[in-house]
Amino acid sequence: GSEMCIRDRFFTEYYGNPSSVYNFAQKSKMAIEDAREIIADSIGAAKSNEIYFTGGGSESDNWALKSAAFGLRDKGNHIITTKIEHHAILNTCAYLEKNGFEVTYLDVDSEGFVSLEDVENAITDKTILISVMLANNEIGTIEPVCEIGEIAHKHGILFHTDAVQAMCHVPINVTEMNIDLLSASGHKFNGPKGVGFMYMKNTAKLEPFIHGGAQERARRAGTSNVPGIVGMGQAVKLALGTLDKDTHTIINMRNYIVDRILGEIPDVTFDGPCIDADAYVNAVSVGLPMCSLKRLPSNMHFCFKDVSGDSLLIMLDMNGICASSGSACALSLIHI
């Protein structure tokens, strides 16, 4: 669509290096800054210079956790997260544990929600960072990040959220949601693969993760992926332009499928938060959408008793239905 057309022009016409001073290159630089403005506005960032472009969600997660941990080490060495985070968070935490940090992994309830009381009780005088995903990629649970951010700030603790699964699928406002650091990836909202961003509140001031040149205000070295960044900016613009309409359509389709499967196939369980058909409408009306939503509108997760998952996926695939028995990052481990 239009995202691809605009992106492709920066492969074929405006291919100058945005770090150079000549006019041809400045067209690329202007396009990057336009994308930065679009993304900043889309998540309610106070300033566009709080958006840093990266190679994807995994890099953003690594940057947030490692730079926060090592940068705040003089204040403490304790990090709080959950057991249901993406591998980019869990494996980074494991790395930090090997380097002298202590990590508390919180349990979640049967619907995937982390307890606010558990978050509060896990905090110590050594806690420097709390990282809880905004929305789970397998069962769709939207965590109470607004309240978790409040708890973190009450104790003077930095709060990071992995919003890879949520970006452009539900409304996000980093200011109202008390978020200091946020990770996202373009491929999750019809943007290009291999490009993402991190929101870093100006007061956070994390150290660079990738060292080298002065790109991204000397916070993230490396020649900018201009087509990827421009494409991601356009994808955000397109997705948010039809978010309300698309969400209602998706919710209706999702609920139809859930009702048919649960009503016609025996011994099936629907995992994750219960579906509230009016949740999105009600949430939008109160002005803080995310704090009222419990599940991603597009998410479904079923368990079929006495059925081979691989066989079921093959049959679905043969009928033109794309489904998975786990997250893509976890499935790739099977083939190692």
Task: Show where each model-derived region lies.
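Pyridoxal 5′-phosphate
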Residues: 1-3, 7-333
